[in-house]
């Protein structure tokens, strides 16, 4: 790790500031107990930035992110700003421009089922008795969401719309390399998702992935069509390790993997560019309905910080300790409202304190 690691903190809207406060506790421990040299600066973004500065992504925020080594992001958006034109709303006008500006082409979404929380999964207990730990690797800047032409047309009293799925071989190549590299840190398995029996873009996808796989002979590669993959995840999620997906298919698959864990409040995510600059954020939204009530689950935000430590700072052992602190908290029976079966649950700040204590003491 470099001598001083600079992190831009963007709490955002809704529950973002609340759960970010708990991440700050972990950051303090990293500095005080693990002697990490961190430079932390907080910046405004999203709806709160619109309210205060008239724009969702202020220049000061963008500059602060540019001068940092990583971004720890909270959440943006809420009904309060739904009256704005869609392209000026917090989600469209802050997070998407950040991804574009830094060319964050790869999105990682872990989906892990903790044994203590199996009862929350919508999947039958006999299917998930052995748990699962899946990492979705999604290409984020290509595919049908960005392909041209894309339009909606009304002509001769007939209306039609069209989008274009476009993938270049280099886009597939770089995301495939990342998936195989990550598989080497896990169970050495990659399953690539496509629709190569129908789509030309998927035929190219499969060909490039096959070519890349030859550079990783120790990693087992399999392929599934997207329709079969969605079924297999429900039937036996434990069979998967790393899922390699295009933008559209990754959007679908990562949400499916998330929902079968039982609580999206547990799930972190990370997005990278080719220089390993990353944006780390919870997979869930801003949850404005519970904002300010001190009931949000801070685990996704804390695990997002863990991903920053693991992938950004390359400090796997310290990231493992953060992950272990979360696991120990759950094993000891501590719960927030979203993962509790009764009214005996912890507030957001209390859960953060518990995890912080386990991180310091290790038991």
Curated annotation (Swiss-Prot):
<feature type="binding site">
    <location>
        <position position="255"/>
    </location>
    <ligand>
        <name>Mg(2+)</name>
    </ligand>
</feature>
<keyword id="KW-0028">Amino-acid biosynthesis</keyword>
<feature type="binding site">
    <location>
        <begin position="78"/>
        <end position="91"/>
    </location>
    <ligand>
        <name>NAD(+)</name>
    </ligand>
</feature>
<feature type="binding site">
    <location>
        <position position="138"/>
    </location>
    <ligand>
        <name>substrate</name>
    </ligand>
</feature>
<feature type="site" description="Important for catalysis">
    <location>
        <position position="145"/>
    </location>
</feature>
<keyword id="KW-0963">Cytoplasm</keyword>
<feature type="binding site">
    <location>
        <position position="227"/>
    </location>
    <ligand>
        <name>substrate</name>
    </ligand>
</feature>
<keyword id="KW-0520">NAD</keyword>
<dbReference type="GO" id="GO:0005829">
    <property type="term" value="C:cytosol"/>
</dbReference>
<dbReference type="GO" id="GO:0003862">
    <property type="term" value="F:3-isopropylmalate dehydrogenase activity"/>
</dbReference>
<feature type="site" description="Important for catalysis">
    <location>
        <position position="195"/>
    </location>
</feature>
<keyword id="KW-0432">Leucine biosynthesis</keyword>
<keyword id="KW-0560">Oxidoreductase</keyword>
<feature type="binding site">
    <location>
        <position position="99"/>
    </location>
    <ligand>
        <name>substrate</name>
    </ligand>
</feature>
<dbReference type="InterPro" id="IPR019818">
    <property type="entry name" value="IsoCit/isopropylmalate_DH_CS"/>
</dbReference>
<keyword id="KW-0614">Plasmid</keyword>
<dbReference type="Pfam" id="PF00180">
    <property type="entry name" value="Iso_dh"/>
</dbReference>
<dbReference type="GO" id="GO:0009098">
    <property type="term" value="P:L-leucine biosynthetic process"/>
</dbReference>
<dbReference type="GO" id="GO:0051287">
    <property type="term" value="F:NAD binding"/>
</dbReference>
<keyword id="KW-0464">Manganese</keyword>
<dbReference type="InterPro" id="IPR004429">
    <property type="entry name" value="Isopropylmalate_DH"/>
</dbReference>
<feature type="binding site">
    <location>
        <position position="109"/>
    </location>
    <ligand>
        <name>substrate</name>
    </ligand>
</feature>
<keyword id="KW-0100">Branched-chain amino acid biosynthesis</keyword>
<keyword id="KW-0479">Metal-binding</keyword>
<feature type="binding site">
    <location>
        <position position="251"/>
    </location>
    <ligand>
        <name>Mg(2+)</name>
    </ligand>
</feature>
<feature type="binding site">
    <location>
        <begin position="285"/>
        <end position="297"/>
    </location>
    <ligand>
        <name>NAD(+)</name>
    </ligand>
</feature>
<dbReference type="InterPro" id="IPR024084">
    <property type="entry name" value="IsoPropMal-DH-like_dom"/>
</dbReference>
<dbReference type="GO" id="GO:0000287">
    <property type="term" value="F:magnesium ion binding"/>
</dbReference>
<protein>
    <recommendedName>
        <fullName>3-isopropylmalate dehydrogenase</fullName>
        <ecNumber>1.1.1.85</ecNumber>
    </recommendedName>
</protein>
<comment type="similarity">
    <text>Belongs to the isocitrate and isopropylmalate dehydrogenases family. LeuB type 1 subfamily.</text>
</comment>
<comment type="function">
    <text>Catalyzes the oxidation of 3-carboxy-2-hydroxy-4-methylpentanoate (3-isopropylmalate) to 3-carboxy-4-methyl-2-oxopentanoate. The product decarboxylates to 4-methyl-2 oxopentanoate.</text>
</comment>
<keyword id="KW-0460">Magnesium</keyword>
<comment type="pathway">
    <text>Amino-acid biosynthesis; L-leucine biosynthesis; L-leucine from 3-methyl-2-oxobutanoate: step 3/4.</text>
</comment>
<comment type="subunit">
    <text>Homodimer.</text>
</comment>
<feature type="binding site">
    <location>
        <position position="227"/>
    </location>
    <ligand>
        <name>Mg(2+)</name>
    </ligand>
</feature>
